[in-house]
Amino acid sequence: MYDSPNADMGYDIRDYEKIMSEFGTMEDFDTLLREIHKRDIKLVMDLAVNHSSDEHAWFIESRKSLDNPCRDYYIWRDGKNGKEPNNWSSFFTPSAWSYDEKNRTMVPASVQ
């Protein structure tokens, strides 16, 4: 439901404060919330906070330099002998890592 380029079924969130256009607008969401509260219904939303999209503002910032304040928001690792830093796998990709050309280092695949 959160704004996402939808590379991994919407878990790659681009903006945690926006609604994905396929689901409507923030005004639509506000209306939904008002209407369900009138009926004494609560809304529980799933939220993946352990990763984001490579289009998220923090990730874009983190790539700018090694000393960027957002750099530590993500896990960056050097590969080993031209390969991934470890053998972790991913649900969405064979490896949990992908190579970031700009930084010449590895970043978890869920971000890329």
Regions of interest found by a model, annotated:
Residues 1-112:
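Acidic/aromatic-lined carbohydrate-recognition and catalytic surfaces
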